[in-house]
């Protein structure tokens, strides 16, 4: 544990940020899972709607550095391909 006042403050801030980022990361994963679930049901309209809800959230968090930009691009690319492959 830190002894210096500023180090204690930084530890508190770091823990606070960690919890905030964990909840945001969980939210992003949930939106991605909703798209996969819609694809699994075979409903193309629902899958497209879930994708359009997910896309700006993934982009925003990739821009802020919560997830890597390549990971965001990979998710969007894979999901788009799966949605387009649906009948």
Swiss-Prot record:
Keywords: Ribonucleoprotein, Ribosomal protein, RNA-binding, rRNA-binding. One of its GO terms (biological process) is translation. InterPro entries: Ribosomal_bS20, Ribosomal_bS20_sf. Disulfide bonds: none annotated. Residues 1-26 are annotated as: Disordered. It holds the Pfam family Ribosomal_S20p. The keyword Glycoprotein does not apply. GO terms for molecular function: small ribosomal subunit rRNA binding; structural constituent of ribosome. One of its GO terms (cellular component) is cytosol. Gene3D superfamilies: Ribosomal protein S20. Binds directly to 16S ribosomal RNA. Belongs to the bacterial ribosomal protein bS20 family. This is Small ribosomal subunit protein bS20. The lineage of its organism: Bacteria, Pseudomonadati, Pseudomonadota, Gammaproteobacteria, Enterobacterales.
């Amino acid at each position: 544990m830190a002894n210096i006042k500023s180090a204690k403050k930084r530890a508190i801030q770091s823990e606070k940020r960690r919890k905030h980022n964990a909840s945001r990361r969980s939210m992003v994963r949930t939106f991605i899972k909703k798209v996969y679930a819609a694809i699994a049901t075979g409903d193309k309209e629902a899958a497209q709607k879930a994708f359009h809800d997910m896309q700006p959230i993934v982009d925003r968090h990739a821009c802020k550095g919560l997830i890597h930009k390549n990971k965001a691009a990979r998710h969007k690319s894979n999901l788009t391909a799966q949605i387009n492959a649906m009948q």
